[in-house]
Amino acid sequence: MNNHNFFFGFDSIFMYRNDNGLVQLVKNITNGQKVGEIDNLYSPNSFGHIKQDKLFDETVIPNYDDIEWSKYFFPERIVIDRLSYRCFWAKCNFCSINSNKRIKQMSSVKQQISKVKTLHEKYEVSNFWFLDEACPMKLALGFAEGIKHENIAWSLRTRLDDKLTFEVLTKLKEAGLKELWIGLEHVNPKILSLMNKSDFNFEYKTIAQKVFDDATANNIGLHFCHILGFPSETDEQRQEVADFYKMTKDSICKKPFFTTFNIFGLMLGSPMFESREKFGIIEALDEESKFNMIKVPYKTIYNDDTGNIQVIQRLSEWIFRYTDILVRKKELIPLWMSISDTPFEFLLKKYYTYNPFSNYELD
């Protein structure tokens, strides 16, 4: 890594997790000492010691003693954390998030339970917003079993999976799960295959419909992540997504429901970046002066690169179409968009047994 332009907004970055190193960084800065010898810390002028195989210390419990809870912005105290270290699938062609997590360290259910119980008791926090990339169900179920009598509410992020059965969702609900995030991304089998999204691409919609119905029956609010503008994606394939939302909206829209619409970006370090020709990418401007952080300007044989303003405008129109399907009360669309992807969304799902953005109520 030799791109100094990465440091336009910060002085240094931990390339791999190092809890003890973070503590040492604070001590060194406080004492006016150099930081260049801290493991896994990288800066333009001091390269440190990069250790890809360094395990992180799970026993570290966050300390929030310096937070003035009386001035807390949200109506209830919410702790943001994660249960797992990395995505258990880690095969999506568009994603580079796990490219710097080469060790498959598994989180300890026992330690996660201990952490949450400690924070719950010490800080009187009863809401936990877990931002996992994709939490394995075995870990989630073990955690749920350990905290089901703690009277806490929590959110979980995972993948669409046939292991998300009604029985599994019931156990999670009984342990306080209020919100489930799923990286749906698309529903067209060809696009899903190009994404390498799952090993059941042709059954994807059927499994998704079942998960949606079962989550709604368990009073669990949903949030989807969706990618538009994947190279070679056509309007017909985008319409397939719209038709899917129309088919499922009576189920998913009974509870507060939100979607994050992401415009595709070519990510440095992703399988797509390494095998560009396979995806019709004929040019990627990967010189250090051509991009900020990890999204790389590119061109495709389909003339659909998302750096093109006309392409962006067309994709934006599709986002409005999708939103129009999912939010029936049009006057509330700005509120729906502003709440999405925030703890306010989580709190809405915690307390609302109906969808205020639609006209449905649960039986």
Predicted segments with their positions:
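Glycine-rich beta-alpha loop elements in corrinoid/cobalamin-binding modules
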Residues: 1-51, 269
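Radical SAM enzyme core and accessory elements
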Residues: 289-363
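Glycine/serine-rich loop-strand microenvironments at binding/catalytic pocket rims
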Residues: 206-235, 341-363
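Short, electropositive alpha-helical surface patch
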Residues: 143-153, 232-252
